[in-house]
Every structure is written in C-alpha cells, then in structure tokens.
C-alpha cells in the first residue's frame, strides 16, 4: 500500500535520497546551471514536500513549489534506486498531481535538463501529459539547451 508523508526531511532515508538526488543532478549538469534545491531550500513556506512509501520502504519523493496562487512547479522528484524501472515514477507524478489539485493549482510546470542523463525524466514527464513550453518563472532560455520546460493544465 502506498503511503504519503508530508515534510519528513529529517527521516534518514529521505535525507539520503535527496542528498543522492542533489549530487547526481549537479554532476549531470553544466557547472552553475542546476536549479536543484537543497533541503533548506525545500523547507521554505512556498514549497510542499512529500515522500512516498510502499510497504514501509521509501519509494520516492517530490515537491510542489507555488509560483503564484494557481501555478505550481514540481521540484526534487526522485524514485529510490530499488524502485526504478518498475513504473513507480508515474506513481510519484500522479500523487503530486493529486496533491496539486487539492491545493487548487491549475497549472503545473517542470524544469529538467536536456542532456542524456535527463532523458528518462523527460520521457516520464511527457507520458504524464507535460508538453514543452517557453521558460517560466525565473528560468531563462540558454544557448546549450539545458532546460526542457513542460507544462500541463489541471481541469
């Protein structure tokens, strides 16, 4: 059974998963171009964070950053290595979409990298209904095409 816990950054397994996520993204991105948030960055009031557990094992996590009253951005979406390649990424995305709807978010966006490392994430986001869009919020278009900016509208 899938269990969701909001804001449990201090759980050692969640902390380790996020730490690994930060390291991987920084290593896979051109220097100075990452927009990944560390744990203090995820703890700000405009961000909600959830970890998802399957039979008491950490499956993954993700966050929703409020850009304004009805526009949210997904951040720090990561599936635990033990749950990868088993269609669990879609469970994390679907959970975040449900939470966003509960919070009256009408538009969702995701920023992700354009390199080979990010191809599985782009495939997951595209399969979830996200489509490319121009840069949003504080993001800028960059010459090395680091950003892919999909957006979906919630009805």
Predicted regions and their residues:
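Conserved N-terminal entry element of GNAT/NAT acetyltransferase domains
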Residues: 1-12
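Conserved beta-strand in the GNAT
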Residues: 51, 57-65, 73, 78
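A short, internal acetyl-CoA/4′-phosphopantetheine-binding micro-motif in the GNAT/acyltransferase core
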Residues: 77-84, 114
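Conserved acetyl-CoA pyrophosphate-binding loop and the N-cap/start of the following alpha-helix
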Residues: 83, 87-95
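Conserved GNAT acetyl-CoA-binding A-motif
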Residues: 101-112
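Conserved beta-strand-loop-alpha-helix junction that forms the acyl-donor binding cleft
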Residues: 110-121, 139-142
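Conserved active-site alpha-helix within GNAT-family acetyltransferase domains
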Residues: 115-134
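Conserved small/polar residues in nucleotide/adenosyl-binding loops
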Residues: 145-151
């Amino acid at each position: 059974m899938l269990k969701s816990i909001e804001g449990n950054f201090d759980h050692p397994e969640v902390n380790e998963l996020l730490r690994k996520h930060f390291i991987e993204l920084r290593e896979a991105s051109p220097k100075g171009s990452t927009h990944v948030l560390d744990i203090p960055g995820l703890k700000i009031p405009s961000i909600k964070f959830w970890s998802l557990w399957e039979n008491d094992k950490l499956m993954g996590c993700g966050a929703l950053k409020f850009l304004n009253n009805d526009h949210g951005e997904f951040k720090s979406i990561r599936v635990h290595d033990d749950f990868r390649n088993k269609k669990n990424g879609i469970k994390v995305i679907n959970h975040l979409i449900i939470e966003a709807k509960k919070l009256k978010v009408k538009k969702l966006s995701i920023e992700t990298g354009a390199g080979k490392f990010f191809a599985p994430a782009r495939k997951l986001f595209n399969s979830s209904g996200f489509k490319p869009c121009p840069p949003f919020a504080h993001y800028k278009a960059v010459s090395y095409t680091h950003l892919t900016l999909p957006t979906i509208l919630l009805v």
